[in-house]
């Protein structure tokens, strides 16, 4: 894109053949349906371990990298994140912002790696507190449990 060089990363998990375009020097990554604001894509034919590896790879990017996501499911994702981590003040603040943006009809599909590390339960699946909350000892199993909980979530 212009003078910006992108690396193409294979990021399976959401769907076979899913790719992300990463320009770390430009602090930009087009992540499609792997990461959403406070969420992640469903698993359509791929596996939870594949998705966990893809999310974990994206999480290695610097915190100030802007993520361009594929959809705006932020309001629903925020309700789920708040239900999973009711004591997380960063999630509560961001969930309130999601409600305001949804009420105003504002599309929200840009975020940063740092914001997602603080407020996205799927990127937090490997943290000891999250694994303990979910009764899991393995980050991949913790992610799989969260993904199933989100699939079943009606909040």
Predicted segment positions?
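Catalytic core of the metallo-beta-lactamase
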Residues: 1-85, 144-147, 153
């Amino acid at each position: 894109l212009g003078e910006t060089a992108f690396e193409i990363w294979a990021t399976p998990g959401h769907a076979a053949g899913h790719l992300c375009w990463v320009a770390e020097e430009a602090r930009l990554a087009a992540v499609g349906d792997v990461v959403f604001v406070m969420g992640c894509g469903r698993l359509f034919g791929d596996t939870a371990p594949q998705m966990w590896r893809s999310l974990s790879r994206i999480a290695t990017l610097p915190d100030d990298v802007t993520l361009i996501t594929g959809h705006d499911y932020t309001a629903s994702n925020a309700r789920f994140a708040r239900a999973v981590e009711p004591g997380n003040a960063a999630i509560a603040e961001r969930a309130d912002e999601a409600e305001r943006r949804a009420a105003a009809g504002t599309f929200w599909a840009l975020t940063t790696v740092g914001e997602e590390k603080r407020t996205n339960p799927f990127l937090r699946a490997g943290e000891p507190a999250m694994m303990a909350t979910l009764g899991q000892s393995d980050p991949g199993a913790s992610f799989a449990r969260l993904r199933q909980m989100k699939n079943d979530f009606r909040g």
